[in-house]
Structures are given as C-alpha cells and as structure tokens.
Amino acid sequence: MTGSQVIDAEEDRHKLVVEYKDTLQPADFYHNFKQRGIRSVQLIPHLEFDELGDLTPASVTAELWGKFLIALFECWVRADISRISIELFDATLQKWCGSENPHPRRDCQACDWHRLCPHAREETPDSMLCAGYQAFYSYTAPHMRVMRDLIKQHRSPMELMTMLR
C-alpha cells in the first residue's frame, strides 16, 4: 500500500496506519486495499511527535484527516456498503441507530458530535484530530440518516447506493 501498513490482522480486520502521504490520495488508498481483497478495516491515523512535541511531517493533520475520511466515505457509500467494513463508518452508523456514547470527556460535551465520536470518552492523541472527525460527521450525517431510516424500515442500507446513482 502507498505508505500504509497492515500492523495487525485479527479476525480478518486489518489495522491500517494512515500517514500524511496517504491523506493526499484517499481514492488510491481505498482502491489499493480493496484490490488486495481486504474487506474489514480499522483506520489508524499516524501521529508521531518530535523531541519538541511537534507533529512530524509523516503525521496526519486534522484538516487532512477529515478530508481523507470524507473521500473514503464517498468511495464506500457509492459502491461498497455492507461489502467492505470500515470500523469508523460502522461505528458511526451504529450510533445513529441508537447506540449511545456514555460519559463524554468534559472538553467534548459541548461538541455537537460527541455522541458519535469514539474519542469523546478518553484522553487520546486523536483529540488532536477533532476538527477532522467533526468534518467527517457533519458531511456524512445526511447519508447516515438515510441508512438509519432504511434499517428502521427493515431494509438494507445498501439501498442508499442505488439512491446515489
């Protein structure tokens, strides 16, 4: 893969590290793992700090992380709903369908998206990427609403792919 690596493959879920260079070509990143037959993915943003505590050039930024997630979502939502499992997308849809995010961190309580965000419960370096996650949640909200409503009607969320054509 272009700079990304499978660091663990457990129960067929591949953990892929997303580096700065990957965020510049999200469609290539998506099609690359799809062509390799990978059907279940956990995306891990690469955050590395130098001795001064600053992000290294290989690290993703919040803005690029958001754009990357949105571009990946666009690939997935148009062709691969229920065919490829991307953990963040699956977890987000589960939250839209009613699963709650208990006890968000104090600094996350004012965020409109804390109920969806897996990082709202813990202090992690990923909180540096809040703006990216917020952009992703905002962008995907209309699609998530439609998929949630399809599921409530005992229909497949895959029907959204046809609606988007």
Where is each model-derived feature located?
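Radical SAM enzyme [4Fe-4S]-AdoMet core and its adjacent flexible, acidic
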Residues: M1-S99
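Flexible mid-to-C-terminal extensions adjoining Fe-S/redox cofactors in radical SAM and related proteins
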Residues: E100-R165
